[in-house]
Amino acid sequence: MRTLSRKIAVVVGGHGGIGGAIAERFATEGATVYATSRRAEEGGGDLGGGRLYPRRVDASDLTALADFFEVVGSEAGRVDVLVVNAGISEFATLDDISQDHFDRTFNLNVRAMLFAAKAATAIMPDGGSIVLVGSIADAIGTKGYGVYGATKAAVRSFARTWANELATRNIRVNVVAPGPTDTAMMAAASDEVRETLTKLIPLGRMGRVDEIASAALFLASDQSSYITGAELPVDGGMAQV
């Protein structure tokens, strides 16, 4: 039996990059996966041992997000696993931070995450799992990414609180915290930026999206049945040693 056989999973921010890798991995492990994105092409079908249904949803639009979960509840009846990956990261030092930058980042990285979790747990059976995609930025003060780091610290804090609140339902809440990862966004960075980041990673390379997906799968599945309220860094040791 595959790791997520017969599970209903939702990946908010599940198109391309880390989120896309998680959605595809969950489907190949037997889950029926609803993956949201502002750019998703609606449709979907069989993938490996499961099914993948892309859905076009702007997670920062709370009405659209609520409507999406109503559709999932109507079609699938429940959500066994929730992954919240939707987020943005923009450079701005303290002198340059604007209200728009702050609101835009917190609205997607924190507010959307909170209300996705609220909607999902309303139709999640006991024994479900929530995986929040955080970042090692919650633990290190990267110049120019103060607002982003603060949103990821909020993610970490919510995981602790929700793990306590949902424990009576045996719903586990954990964070997977990637370090620099080889995505299309990272590929667009300058060679200098990539080289500088790589030098800070003890393993000497950036992470791969499939490595992040493997960590998310572990936290989503019964393989981590005695883990809740935790953060799993997947950063090549960057923020650990």
Residue ranges of each PLM-predicted region?
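Residue(s) in the substrate-gating loop at a strand-loop-helix junction
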Residues: 135
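Active-site helix of classical SDR
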Residues: 117, 151, 159
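Conserved glycine-rich cofactor-binding loop
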Residues: 8, 15-16
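Alpha-helical segment proximal to the catalytic Tyr-Lys
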Residues: 122-123, 164-168, 225
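Substrate-binding pocket helix/loop in short-chain dehydrogenase/reductase
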Residues: 93-94, 98-106, 186, 193-197
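Active-site loop immediately N-terminal to the catalytic Tyr-X3-Lys motif
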Residues: 95, 127, 140-146, 168, ...
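Short C-terminal tail/terminal secondary-structure segment
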Residues: 140, 217, 228-241
